[in-house]
Structure formats: C-alpha cells, structure tokens
Amino acid sequence: EVKLVESGGGLVQPGGSLSLSCATSGFTFIDYYMSWFRQPPGKALEWLGLIRNKGNGYTMEYSASLKGRFTISRDNSQSIVYLHMNTLTAEDSATYYCARVDYGTNYDYWGQGTTLTVSSAKTTAPSVYPLAPVCGDTTGSSVTLGCLVKGYFPEPVTLTWNSGSLSSGVHTFPAVLQSDLYTLSSSVTVTSSTWPSQSITCNVAHPASSTKVDKKIEPRGPTIKPCPPCKCPAPNS
C-alpha cells in the first residue's frame, strides 16, 4: 500500500525558516518524481516544485513565485522528500502536501497535509464548550448535539466524536479567524434513543499547545414547562 505522510508544520515567526518532511512507503522511491503543493486558507492549490527520479539525476524544478526561498531535497535511503523554506511571510501560511508524480502532471498519491502558520501571534489553547438541547426539546426521532472550540491559535485542531467511533451525522464547520484567534464548531445528529441514554463525547486536540480535551455532552435542565393557556369562564347569562 502506497503511503505519504507529511510532518513538520506548526507556528513560525515571520522571517523564520522551517523544513517539512514527507515519509513515503509502499513503492520504489528512487523511480518516482516527488512534488510539493500548498493550499492557503480559502485559496486554490498551488504547485511549488518537484524533484526528479534517479534516471533524471534527482534534478529540481520550482515555481517562479517562490523567488528562490524554497528548496526540495530527498533522502533515498529513508524514502523521504523534504521542503526547506526560508524568509517566511504570512502569505506562506497554508496546508502543505506532497504528491507522487505518476507521469507528466498526473499525481496519483497524496499525503494528508501538514499546516504551517506564519504569524507573530502567540500559541493559545482552545476552550471547549459542549452544546446540548434543553430537556423537553428532544421529542422528535433525532437530536442534534454540538461542540464549540473557541479562542485557539494556530490551526489546526482535530475534533472527533466518541474518539472517532461516531462519524455518521457529523458536520464540522470551517474554522473562522478573528482577532488572531480561531473558532470552530461541529455538530452530530443521533437518534433520540441514543442520547442521552448513551454517552456522547466531543474530543478536541490542539497539537500546537499540546492540549487534549474531552467534553461529555450532558442534558441541560430540567426545565419548567409553561402552564397551558388559562381558559376564561363563560360569562353569566
């Protein structure tokens, strides 16, 4: 099985340097070109460059937009390809991907990506808030639970439900950046017979701050239901 796994992302100060790595397995590494891409938040995928195979002398080619700041190298004994980056700016903030080149511009295998944030802002751990409906509002056949992850920096956080065992009915919304802090939310819809009789937990990890938080979704309430409308007595005839 072919695998590509990137690592090395994180928070870097403007003007700093960083090297990303892409560990590969499942194929004869020296026979293939390897390429790097990046995708800034809300923007298109951008090709950065490639390093050719043994038959082509392991030569490199780069996007002109990089202006010589990035270098690609490979360790053939370890089947790893690297991306070395210098003089980083906020515009370099992106998720970086490595890809195997099948032929020409056909990329047949990709990694999952590693995120780089270039900023002078400080690392901040998230606050995690479980969101549950008020008792009495779960009379239908399904119920939607939520999890709010607020005030963290930098990206990314990972959010799962029941440590990943609950994946059906999950909707995780894109993170929003405001005042140098991110906010992210996720919801999961389950049957009313599942919750609250069974435990449901929101699991959040923020690698940059080494934070892991598990929040069990507890029912809110009990609440006082309003009285039925009063009925006026019929007037005396």
From Swiss-Prot:
GO cellular component: extracellular region; immunoglobulin complex
InterPro entries membership: Ig-like_dom, Ig-like_dom_sf, Ig-like_fold, Ig_C1-set, Ig_sub, Ig_V-set, IgHV
Subcellular location: Secreted
Region listing for D segment, in residue ranges: 101-105
Disulfide-bond pairs as recorded: 22-98, 147-202
GO terms, biological process: immunoglobulin mediated immune response
Transmembrane portions of the chain: none
Key words of the record: Adaptive immunity, Disulfide bond, Immunity, Immunoglobulin, Repeat, Secreted
Taxonomic superkingdom: Eukaryota
Chain residue ranges for the region called JH2 segment: 106-120
GO molecular function annotations of the record: antigen binding
Domain Ig-like: 1-119, 126-218
Main location: secreted
Function comment: Anti-influenza H3N2 neuraminidase antibody.
Protein name: Ig heavy chain Mem5
